[in-house]
């Protein structure tokens, strides 16, 4: 089970790998679309890689609710619990 | 009480005699005359050329005019494929048309195409959307080897512009028109590997005609268009289909390093790129990227890409190509073939 800071760190690495965005830029209050400029297909790639890394399932219907980095971290933490 | 019916037992059936192997002998394509650049469609969807290219890799597409129908485009592609195969038209014994945009509920397009080619052979349509061409190749392979036909014309054709909502931001720039065809016939050596195919109807709503014909009639709706849940399709196409492609390679008894071409359905450049990454294909293998100037022509996309790449010398005649189609249904089919 990963802590919230570990999830954030892992997520930042996944975002960096997909988009090249610096890991330090991936902060909890940032919006994936508005702040990080991540489009829907990159978001799906991030979701699938996060599923694999954290051993969780993020349904397609849930992805649209993950607006900020915090949303994603909370969802992953909840799904792991 | 009468006794249970018993067979006469006097007649023995003659089994059809098929060819030992089958292969693709030639491919042909038809690209509609009118080139439609992104600039022509961006205003309606409040978009830009850059936005479309970033999300799909598409720079332009062809949209068929009123004189270019599913049937006429099929005929043009078929004639080219027959010529490339080096056979006479009257040697064709079956015509399979894969399409989702033939504007008649019935009859099928195939008999009309056959008639236009001067043929009276078996002719039928299949509905397997973007996977239709690979379904057709598999059927043709089985027909040739099973003895139900000698040379088979497999045609993938779409006029998706008739079923596209120009204001739909998720599909307006994706769908396009065209036809591709292949001639499959007997061969001394194996030319079509085992097909890995299947369906997931639980996801039927991810790509579909938005309203049924009955809803259109009963609710007085406009002519229906095809809608798509892009993200769900993307996930399924990349992470669901890469293993299918790998299974087709394995079933063919080869390795990825043996391939001379990777010809995925031209759905979206992002899907193609992600799939190549997932498959860990050796970097030297040419990958079909016909989508840049053709967009997504559904059933026509693989034969159109094949025809272009062969013509431009990008892939070798006689080489091994992995082809995979996937789309509405959801359905998929993949096989390794020897290029004509």
Model-derived segments and spans:
Chain A
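Short coil/turn motifs that cap or connect alpha-helices
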Residues: 22, 57-59
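Thiotemplate assembly-line natural product biosynthesis machinery
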Residues: 2-24, 77-80
């Amino acid at each position: 089970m990963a802590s919230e800071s570990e999830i954030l760190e892992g997520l930042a690495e996944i975002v960096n790998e997909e988009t090249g965005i610096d890991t330090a830029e991936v902060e909890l209050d940032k919006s994936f679309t508005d702040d990080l400029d991540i489009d829907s297909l990159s978001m799906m790639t991030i979701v699938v890689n996060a599923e694999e890394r954290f051993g969780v399932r993020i349904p397609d219907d849930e992805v649209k609710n993950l607006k900020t980095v915090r949303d994603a971290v909370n969802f992953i933490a909840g799904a792991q619990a | 009480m009468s006794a249970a019916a018993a067979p006469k037992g006097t007649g023995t059936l003659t089994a059809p005699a098929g060819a030992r192997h089958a292969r693709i002998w030639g491919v042909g394509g038809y690209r509609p005359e009118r080139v439609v650049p992104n600039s022509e469609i961006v205003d309606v969807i409040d978009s830009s050329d850059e936005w479309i290219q970033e999300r799909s890799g598409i720079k332009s597409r062809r949209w068929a005019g009123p004189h270019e129908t599913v049937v006429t485009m099929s005929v043009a592609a078929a004639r080219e494929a027959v010529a490339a195969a080096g056979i006479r038209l009257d040697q064709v014994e079956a015509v399979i048309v894969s399409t989702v945009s033939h504007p008649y509920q019935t009859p099928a397009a195939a008999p009309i195409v056959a008639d236009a080619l001067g043929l009276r052979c078996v002719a039928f349509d299949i509905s397997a959307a973007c996977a239709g061409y690979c379904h057709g190749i598999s059927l043709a392979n089985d027909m040739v080897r099973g003895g139900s036909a000698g040379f088979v014309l497999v045609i993938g054709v779409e006029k998706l512009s008739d079923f596209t909502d120009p204001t739909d931001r998720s599909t307006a720039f994706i769908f396009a028109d065209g036809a591709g065809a292949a001639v499959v016939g007997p061969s001394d050596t194996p030319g079509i590997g085992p097909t890995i195919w299947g369906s997931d109807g639980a996801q039927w709503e991810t790509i579909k005609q938005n309203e049924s014909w009955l809803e259109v009639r009963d609710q007085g709706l406009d002519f229906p268009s095809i809608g798509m849940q892009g993200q769900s399709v993307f996930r399924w196409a990349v992470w669901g289909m890469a293993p299918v492609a790998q299974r087709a390679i394995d079933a063919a008894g080869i390795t990825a390093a043996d391939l001379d071409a990777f010809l995925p359905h031209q759905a979206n450049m992002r899907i193609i790129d992600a799939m190549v990454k997932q498959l860990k294909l050796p970097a030297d293998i040419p990958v079909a990227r016909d989508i840049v100037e053709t967009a997504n022509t559904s059933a026509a996309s693989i034969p159109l890409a094949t025809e272009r790449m062969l013509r431009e010398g990008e892939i070798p005649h006689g080489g091994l190509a992995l082809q995979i189609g996937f789309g509405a249904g959801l359905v998929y089919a993949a096989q390794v073939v020897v290029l004509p």
